[in-house]
């Protein structure tokens, strides 16, 4: 049996493991991880569809939310509209966070080739709500994206296991006569490309994927959207609550599916947290060993701190080191 090297138990080894990866590398690699997790979830959805109890034999479970809210079958479409609206608003907020980062580092506001009165100022001006700004603005857009995408990937990966473990009877009308999946590979690809909207899947109940993304947007704007404009918090809160109502009223999910998803999403988003180094170092361990998709060490200045960069001379075949300080440029 091979004996682990002594340095694995030394403080220097774990210090290297805890050293943060460049933020740009984290953005690229965690986005790739999210795509991989999406395929895992797509396969899990297909397994769940095949394992779902026969609706003709097993009736939907008793649900207090179903008893209190009148059934409106088409409301799930409005839930999708809520998600679409929040997607657009989150992209807009992320861009405004990028402008805040540029303002913090002294880059100024970007300019369009052609100036459109009103429009250019609305999109390219820096919005800052000082009452809710308690976070360092440098790299805030990158850190916010890392926090969002890692939280989403963790929740979808856990959901992949949960929906396969226990099969529940479907409460919605669309799955009372579930269609047969003729081409499994095509269905998996459509699930990833359309986020489930263009594929066949029934029985994926515990917990609600719609609620996960609604709550993620809610948490994103509660923390970061409020830094851009004070109105984002109340607007997103109302939209998210209405989306929850649409999910239950349409019988798309049981009430427990929604409640569990809300709790898990909030807990995960808080646990991942906001850190100048990006994702928690434990999560970075899963992408640290990658030989591609970004550098494993900081070769450029991200926080206006001097770093060491190695330059290789092609003529002499030798390496020289140079300290790069952003403040000197």
Curated annotation (Swiss-Prot):
The record describes its membrane topology as: Multi-pass membrane protein
* Ranges facing Extracellular side: 48-74, 169-211, 255-257
Please tell me where this protein is predominantly located.
membrane
One Gene Ontology term of the molecular function aspect: sphingomyelin synthase activity
Family annotation (Pfam families): PAP2_C
Q: Transmembrane residues, as ranges? A: 27-47, 75-95, 148-168, 212-232, 234-254, 258-278
Recorded E.C. number(s)? 2.7.8.-, 2.7.8.27
GO biological process per UniProt: ceramide biosynthetic process
Q: What happens when the gene is disrupted?
A: Elevated ceramide levels and growth arrest; cells were arrested in division but replication of DNA and organelles continued giving rise to cells containing multiple nuclei, kinetoplasts and flagella.
A GO CC term assigned to this protein in UniProt: endoplasmic reticulum membrane
What does it catalyze? an N-acylsphing-4-enine + a 1,2-diacyl-sn-glycero-3-phosphocholine = a sphingomyelin + a 1,2-diacyl-sn-glycerol; an N-acylsphinganine + a 1,2-diacyl-sn-glycero-3-phosphocholine = an N-acylsphinganine-1-phosphocholine + a 1,2-diacyl-sn-glycerol; an N-acylsphing-4-enine + a 1,2-diacyl-sn-glycero-3-phosphoethanolamine = an N-acylsphing-4-enine 1-phosphoethanolamine + a 1,2-diacyl-sn-glycerol; an N-acylsphinganine + a 1,2-diacyl-sn-glycero-3-phosphoethanolamine = an N-acylsphinganine-1-phosphoethanolamine + a 1,2-diacyl-sn-glycerol
Effect of changing residue 252 to S: reported as: Enhanced inositol-phosphorylceramide (IPC) synthesis without affecting SM or EPC activity creating a trifunctional enzyme
**First-tier enzyme category under EC:** transferase
Q: Which UniProt keywords apply?
A: Kinase, Lipid metabolism, Membrane, Sphingolipid metabolism, Transferase, Transmembrane, Transmembrane helix
Highest taxon listed in the record's lineage: Eukaryota
* Residues in compartment: Cytoplasmic: 1-26, 96-147, 233, 279-329
Kindly list the places in or outside the cell where this protein is found, as annotated in its UniProt entry. Answer: Membrane
Q: Which protein family is named in the record?
A: Belongs to the sphingomyelin synthase family.
Tell me the function of this protein: Bifunctional sphingomyelin (SM)/ethanolamine phosphorylceramide (EPC) synthase with minimal inositol phosphorylceramide (IPC) synthase activity. Specificity is likely to be defined by residues in the lumenal catalytic domain that interact with the polar head groups of the phospholipid donors. SM is synthesized by both stages of the parasite life cycle, bloodstream forms (BSF) and procyclic forms (PCF), by transferring the phosphocholine from a 1,2-diacyl-sn-glycero-3-phosphocholine to an N-acylsphing-4-enine (ceramide) or an N-acylsphinganine (dihydroceramide).
Report what the protein is called: Phosphatidylcholine:ceramide cholinephosphotransferase 3
Tell me the gene name: SLS3
């Amino acid at each position: 049996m091979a004996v682990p090297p002594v340095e694995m138990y030394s403080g220097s080894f774990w210090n290297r493991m805890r050293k943060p990866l460049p933020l740009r590398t984290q953005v690229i690699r965690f986005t790739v991880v999210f795509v991989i997790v999406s395929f895992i979830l797509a396969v899990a959805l297909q397994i769940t569809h095949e394992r779902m109890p026969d609706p003709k034999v097993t009736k939907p479970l008793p649900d207090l939310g179903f008893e209190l809210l009148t059934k409106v079958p088409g409301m799930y479409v409005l839930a999708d509209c809520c998600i679409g609206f929040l997607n657009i608003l989150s992209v807009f907020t992320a861009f405004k966070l990028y402008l805040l980062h540029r303002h913090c580092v002294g880059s100024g506001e970007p300019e369009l080739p052609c100036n459109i009165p009103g429009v250019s100022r609305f999109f390219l001006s820096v919005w800052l709500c000082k009452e809710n700004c308690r976070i360092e603005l440098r790299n805030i857009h990158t850190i916010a994206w890392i926090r969002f995408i890692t939280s989403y990937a963790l929740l979808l990966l856990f959901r992949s296991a949960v929906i396969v473990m226990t099969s529940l009877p479907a409460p919605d009308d669309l799955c009372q006569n579930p269609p047969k999946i003729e081409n499994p590979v095509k269905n998996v690809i459509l699930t990833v490309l359309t986020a489930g909207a263009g594929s066949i899947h029934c029985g994926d109940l515990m917990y609600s994927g719609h609620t996960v993304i609604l709550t993620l947007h809610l948490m994103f704007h509660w923390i970061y959207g409020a830094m851009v404009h004070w109105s984002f918090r109340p607007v997103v809160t109302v939209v998210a609550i209405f989306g929850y109502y649409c999910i239950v009223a349409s019988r798309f999910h049981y009430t427990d599916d929604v409640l569990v998803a809300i709790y898990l999403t909030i807990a995960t988003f808080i646990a991942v947290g906001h850190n100048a180094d990006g994702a928690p170092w434990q999560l970075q361990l899963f992408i640290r060993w990658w030989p591609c998709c970004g550098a494993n060490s900081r070769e450029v200045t991200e926080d206006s701190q001097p770093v060491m960069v190695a330059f290789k001379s092609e003529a002499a075949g030798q390496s020289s080191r140079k300290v790069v300080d952003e403040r000197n440029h």
